[in-house]
Amino acid sequence: TARQLIASVGGTVTPYGVVYDNGMRLEQVYDGQFFPCYYYEPHATMVAVTPKSEPENTEHITWLYLPMAQEEIDRVLQRSGIADSADARLRLEHSQLPDEVNALLDMEHESLADLNALAQATNNFSTDDIKKLGAAVTLAKPQNAEQVKNLAENLDLFDFAPDAHSQAEYGKYMIQQSGHYEFDENLDEFYDYEGYAQQRINDEDGMFTDRGYIAYKGYFSLEEIMEGGQGGSMEMGGMV
């Protein structure tokens, strides 16, 4: 504490006050070419970029905080000596994306352009949106960042009941919380939650996931949506 420092260390009197040596040693971390890693945007997708011509454990790391303008990416890479993004090795260091997405990204085959587009598509996602995207990924099984981006841009084509892991929980969510019905708690014991959910499940393209129940309500197939097909829905609205 300040009192302990004053009591144990002799200070140097200056015209501006008394200066005490607290033992802190400053270290230069910027070498004039590669900036150190630092978190300045909580929702940024952080990608470590190194030249393929150098060992994987090289200390010459360029940090990108996606999404970024393409001109900015090009400028940062050029400053680091990488003239072509194809010559760059990528590593995902941090992201706000759900674990389901992080697990499927193969950084050896992903491009900076696709990762940047995905970061842009999810940049303003809320916590609920992130959970819904994780469930949608489990249902649709995309293979790369571009397909995940296309799912993210069409999340309104999915109905999502968060934390519903059984037919009864799904039915209860629909009747009590979805806003589709006027729920009367005095009649709670008379609702057939499980039966109602079973009827919906039979008519839907959905599944239970670790995050809840999710169903796809679009007109085009999931494969077409993930390949960038025109989004469209046969039903208006959704639960989430």
Regions from the language model: what does each represent?
Residues 45-55:
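A short beta-strand micro-motif
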Residues 1-46, 59, 67-185, 189, ...:
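Mixed-charge (acidic/basic) macromolecular-recognition segments
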